[in-house]
């Protein structure tokens, strides 16, 4: 039989009141924080992705595809507004 590591068994942790008091606050707050992060548009700003209404501008309505492997930088300069 192996020795004890001194850690509490998982079943004791899950059935304790302290576990559920802590997690009944932290789990919903993480969900709400994630929902606010996405719904306010902050996720678009942090990760630099365009918002759904910014994929196609008034000047450019075609798909922004790179078709030439060796001229990709020039095509990218044409597609990205400065």
UniProtKB/Swiss-Prot annotation:
Transmembrane annotation, as ranges: 21-35
UniProt main location, coarse: plastid
The keyword Transmembrane is assigned to this record: yes
Protein keywords: Chloroplast, Electron transport, Heme, Iron, Membrane, Metal-binding, Photosynthesis, Photosystem II, Plastid, Thylakoid, Transmembrane, Transmembrane helix, Transport
Residues holding heme: 23
Cofactor: heme b
Membrane topology recorded in Swiss-Prot or TrEMBL: Single-pass membrane protein
InterPro entries documented for this protein: PSII_cyt_b559_asu, PSII_cyt_b559_asu_sf, PSII_cyt_b559_CS, PSII_cyt_b559_N, PSII_cytb559_asu_lum
Biological processes per GO annotation: photosynthetic electron transport chain
UniProt cross-references to Gene3D superfamilies, sorted A to Z: Photosystem II cytochrome b559, alpha subunit (1.20.5.860)
Pfam families attached to this UniProt entry: Cytochrom_B559, Cytochrom_B559a
Any one annotated GO CC term: chloroplast thylakoid membrane
Subcellular location: Plastid, Chloroplast thylakoid membrane
Cofactor note: With its partner (PsbF) binds heme. PSII binds additional chlorophylls, carotenoids and specific lipids.
GO MF, any single term: heme binding
Quaternary structure, from the entry: Heterodimer of an alpha subunit and a beta subunit. PSII is composed of 1 copy each of membrane proteins PsbA, PsbB, PsbC, PsbD, PsbE, PsbF, PsbH, PsbI, PsbJ, PsbK, PsbL, PsbM, PsbT, PsbX, PsbY, PsbZ, Psb30/Ycf12, at least 3 peripheral proteins of the oxygen-evolving complex and a large number of cofactors. It forms dimeric complexes.
Family: Belongs to the PsbE/PsbF family.
Cited function: This b-type cytochrome is tightly associated with the reaction center of photosystem II (PSII). PSII is a light-driven water:plastoquinone oxidoreductase that uses light energy to abstract electrons from H(2)O, generating O(2) and a proton gradient subsequently used for ATP formation. It consists of a core antenna complex that captures photons, and an electron transfer chain that converts photonic excitation into a charge separation.
NCBIfam families: cyt_b559_alpha (TIGR01332)
Protein name: Cytochrome b559 subunit alpha
Organism in which the protein naturally occurs: Ostreococcus tauri
Name of the gene encoding the protein in the UniProt record: psbE
